[in-house]
Amino acid sequence: MMPEATRSAAGGRPYWNGTAVRSRLFDALSLLLPAGEAFLIETLQAWRAQASTPHDDALHDEIDRFIREEGAHQRAHARYNAALIAGLPGAEAVARRAERVAAGLADLGLPMQVALAAAFEQLTALVSREIVEHDTLLVDDGSQPSRLWRWHAREELDHCDVALAVAARGAPSRWLRRLALVLATGYLASDLVRYTWALCRCDIAAGASRRALLADGIRVMVGSLPALARMARGWLGFAVSPQGRPHGQA
């Protein structure tokens, strides 16, 4: 018999990422992404429109590519989220909260927005390298969600330097970028925990066992320690050298 923590409360279907909490963690991240991708796109567009530095054709082309790829990610996750919400209606409130938080970032000055865009990209790249190189966080079973995340991760690793290049020009203060990294980390970590728990509560309301989900959460936390250690090393590398590539690329 399939363990309870690997079966969805909705019809007993298996959770796509092996267990309940790992699946809901990535579902929560997906609900955050469309609003986050929109912030990244709008920030780079605003910086390019206002940039007073000499025109850089290569960077201009890279920003165009960044915007195209982030737009594709945004649309793909919006479709995934629509299917998630259809099966788990409580997830819609999570997506709306994420949109409100992202909209609040528009009130910040452009240098801080640029610094935050670079910080979010670097954090996403740290997660992406874990997805591409290890199977601690994401199962590699050929499922549609797994393929979606691996495609997204590969493109993030390929274009994260664009946001860093823009930050080097639009937010040249290293201390501002370090502050942005701390703020982005706190925002992302706290929201992932809150939204993952919100989705798990939806599962509990649909009949899942609270005790089984708690036990699964503990197992996931313990099993994720190697991944968290690798990402922490990358995070520290970025804090020391904000323009660097601590996620391991050459």
Go through the PLM ranges and name each one:
Residues M1-A250:
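Non-heme di-metal
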